[in-house]
Amino acid sequence: MTNIIELPEVLANQIAAGEVVERPASVVKELVENAIDAKSSQITVEIEESGLKMIQVTDNGEGMSHEDLPLSLRRHATSKIKSQSDLFRIRTLGFRGEALPSVASISKITIKTATKEVTHGSLLIATGGEIETLEAISTPTGTKIKVENLFYNTPARLKYMKSLQAELAHIVDVVNRLSLAHPEVAFTLISDGRQLTQTSGTGDLRQAIAGIYGLNTTKKMLAISNADLDFEVSGYVSLPELTRANRNYMTILVNGRYIKNFLLNRAILDGYGSKLMVGRFPIVVIDIQIDPYLADVNVHPTKQEVRISKERELMALISTAISESLKEQDLIPDALENLAKSSTRHFSKPEQTQLPLQSRGLYYDPQKNDFFVKESAVSEKIPETDFYFGTVDNSVKVEKAELLPHSEEVIGPSSVKHASRPQNTFTETDHPNLDLKNRQKLSQMLTRLENEEQSVFPELDYFGQMHGTYLFAQGKDGLFIIDQHAAQERVKYEYYRDKIGEVDSSLQQLLVPYLFEFSGSDFINLQEKMALLNEVGIFLEVYGHNTFILREHPIWMKEEEIASGVYEMCDMLLLTNEVSIKTYRAELAIMMSCKRSIKANHSLDDYSARNLLLQLAQCQNPYNCPHGRPVLINFSKADMEKMFRRIQENHTSLRELGKY
């Protein structure tokens, strides 16, 4: 009796499903790719309960004949390749003949299909890979595939499913990538009766980007183009000012197929050069047309890994295309555009009685080492002086008075602000080792910050600055050199750390709400994690397609920081994914303190420099920035005398120093 047996086909398909079908999004990907290969111009994806209950993909493609329909559930049965040579010139998205049998083996599947050559269509129903019904029906040209009760016979796979919102976000991401890869196809995604994605199918990639990432994002995208004898590169890349906290927005397409490739990602970043800050990544959609002989897609059943010949030449082509496109642009932000963002629209003012105003300001008390709110009457126009750097001026500015006619709660386009992403002010030279994705380093950093003890700061007398970066001061212990960025970062960190923890009752209503726009997958993920944002005083409400509205903000957040601050917090939440409130607040304080601090090569006047040293003296730990870098160094009088050889070393002193 032999010990080796040939596995039944259904069991073999279930094993194959372990690689091909990881989650509901995998099913959507395989079915939609089949629809694209069938030359469809319209594809509709409908799901229920994030695909676990039902996934239905309808297309208007070529369809299948009555004879071919049952063969589609046979393993390694395909119409896309017929010989070994075809394997090296693949132009379709599918070719292995594994996807549909694998899906059918772990679900109940219903297929309705018809070709334009016949007067009737066909219906197939299968459960667990076993065909139960095969009959002729009347149905439009094309194919409709319904997958129900996914993983019903593989309960172990269900244990590893994330929340419904997380699985839905994966599906949205898959449809978005395929929409970008095939702008000539009109895609519609409907979840539990609600439309999440819709593209026009005009063939215009820029229009597809607008449908997925929003019009505001598309306006800041540049077209790129480059080619040689082997490759043709085209697409769109974002301006350096428009970035995200991870690589999820970098889409690389090879012959209409979305792929993952580390070296090509690096080529994209190389094209930006020093224009990108550390830890930030651009929004990119790059389409690469390549001779199929130069690309091997038969690497993994998911077909997302592709081996490319002449990869180094392709990298250089991509980098050059991006750098040349950026050179042609004026990367200096438009001052008038920024001014317009900070101003509000004007309306006719109704007659009103002059009333005394109450101004609420947040002030710092150096005696109590704490902040307090003070109200004061304002009789005339409130001065809008905003010193770049004075005493710890974190006053909450009143929204510029905008008298709106009395209206209902409904907010129209004229009474909201569209929030813009923050500009890149954080450079690699500031903190080259800061990586929010490295959870171990972050944990060590936060533990060190929590265990800091109150330090005694020396009394310093400021007398100068060098290269707009270092401050010089003297004290009884000699010469002190202070890194101005690290110093203010420490001051800002302790401020944000304290104030972020006091958000329960410190909210201020906005006269003009802000709108925040996200991609479909990020929008869904943020909805699931909204409670974490609420913990730090950010209350976002759903407002239209992939958009949130902010009606109030925490009092520790300045008016000019609202748009950038909220986006930064959302990016951090999406990046770190699972994070405790305590860690979330600490990470937020670290990041915001760095972004809000003065940078190198910025000259300070004597008043501002002395104020910085006074604030530093009030800190719990004035000697290190939140990332652990030293804030100041000290040269004692003896050190200075040794450097100028006023003190001669002897054998004993050298031996004590371990140098002899």
Curated annotation (Swiss-Prot):
InterPro entries: DNA_mismatch_repair_CS, DNA_mismatch_repair_MutL, DNA_mismatch_S5_2-like, HATPase_C_sf, MutL/Mlh/PMS, MutL/Mlh/Pms-like, MutL_C, MutL_C_dimsub. CDD domains: HATPase_MutL-MLH-PMS-like, MutL_Trans. Disulfide bonds: none annotated. Keywords: DNA damage, DNA repair. Gene3D superfamilies: 3.30.230.10, Histidine kinase-like ATPase, C-terminal domain (3.30.565.10), MutL, C-terminal domain, dimerisation subdomain (3.30.1540.20), MutL, C-terminal domain, regulatory subdomain (3.30.1370.100). SUPFAM superfamilies: ATPase domain of HSP90 chaperone/DNA topoisomerase II/histidine kinase, DNA mismatch repair protein MutL, Ribosomal protein S5 domain 2-like. One of its GO terms (cellular component) is mismatch repair complex. GO terms for molecular function: ATP binding; ATP hydrolysis activity; ATP-dependent DNA damage sensor activity; mismatched DNA binding. The keyword DNA repair applies. GO terms for biological process: mismatch repair. Belongs to the DNA mismatch repair MutL/HexB family. PANTHER family: DNA MISMATCH REPAIR PROTEIN MLH, PMS, MUTL, DNA MISMATCH REPAIR PROTEIN MLH1. NCBIfam families: mutl, PRK00095.1-3. This protein is involved in the repair of mismatches in DNA. It is required for dam-dependent methyl-directed DNA mismatch repair. May act as a 'molecular matchmaker', a protein that promotes the formation of a stable complex between two or more DNA-binding proteins in an ATP-dependent manner without itself being part of a final effector complex. This is DNA mismatch repair protein MutL. It comes from Streptococcus pyogenes serotype M3 (strain ATCC BAA-595 / MGAS315). The lineage of its organism: Bacteria, Bacillati, Bacillota, Bacilli, Lactobacillales. The gene is mutL.
